[in-house]
């Protein structure tokens, strides 16, 4: 194969002509994934490039060759090799960003109503999972505890509404906006950036890192809220207050021992 290539390139018919060899399949995937990213990051950024911050600091060791520090949130850690395939990495990167955004909104929605309720604001059920479960009650669910606002009695109607509304927004984003001009579905900009946060490339690059760091924390927080709801039947702020009042008796280990057989 190498000999044939050498013979072809040395052919007199090709003399003086530039010959471009096609990239390999992995390179094609990597190129297609990088087309959607505008990289204008300062070489001195601590979050990008080979000298970026690593997951264990100076004890991190050499990161995998495919983790070059090009994308936000890359700390050089990929034990499972999830980023080795360029196409899989591109898909997972988009999924992580989208789930991070939903998790941040969800965590705020779980904590804020309970915080208001604990400070005297009355608007119905404040605990996030109890508020949603009211849809199954005989009287249905009044948004913000006000019957003059949206009154819901059918979980199927809510499900259909969410599918339509969320599907429309996601379709708009993936399709590139009304004119199909958006080149990056993860960071579409335009009408999705009314404050112009992406106008400065260096500031935007740092905001991408902040978004992922907070989004990853929010995903772990939401998982914790789910576990708390199942184990204690209380909201996150009530669980926090119980722990601060009696940390010895109100902690993860104490609740875990309740599930020990024979206890």
From Swiss-Prot:
Q: How is the cofactor bound?
A: Binds at least 14 chlorophylls (8 Chl-a and 6 Chl-b) and carotenoids such as lutein and neoxanthin.
- Record gene name: CAB3
Kindly list the positions annotated as binding chlorophyll a 6.
243, 252
- What is the protein name stated in its UniProt record? Chlorophyll a-b binding protein 3, chloroplastic
Record-listed chlorophyll b 2 binding positions: 101, 150, 179
Where is it located?
Plastid, Chloroplast thylakoid membrane
Which residues does this entry mark as bearing N2-acetylarginine?
A: 34
Species for this entry: Glycine max (Soybean)
Q: Where does chlorophyll a 3 bind?
A: 134, 144, 211
